[in-house]
Amino acid sequence: MEVCNTDAEGRLILADAISYVQKQYQLDSILDICTLTGAICVGLGEYTAGLFSNNDEMATALMDAGKKVQERCWRMPIEEEHEEEILNSNVADLRSMGTGRYGGACTAAAFLKQFVKNDLPWAHLDIAGTGMYSKTVDWVPRGGTGYGVQLLIEWLLNKK
């Protein structure tokens, strides 16, 4: 792996965790939630998380759960071009970041996707924006939000 920026270390640790749980456990899906990229804040602001997934059914279930508990998420793409950027290294099998300036949240998700077994439903929630609010919104005070706790519970309660 070509490590392109040592300040983007979170995705390396998360990739290890994704690999580890697949080797150690019988899984029917993987959901990771983390404050991964500032790029998602640029695209969605601080009130909606970025959702990336290799599975439409899982993505829809997560968006529905988020709507129900007022923890919004928006599905973002992992395009073929994002994956090509991750796989385009002159010195390694893959890069930890994309090759360009744009689409940082998408290329970060494309990087994580490389560690998920092809047939395993997976979703990644980038909560870099939603993890902290700059002002009080409804019942959520300024500061740390706990975003994702209610969404995760709702999703698990309704998981088939």
Predicted regions and their residues:
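A generic structural signal for tightly packed, nonpolar segments enriched in small/aliphatic residues
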Residues: 1-160
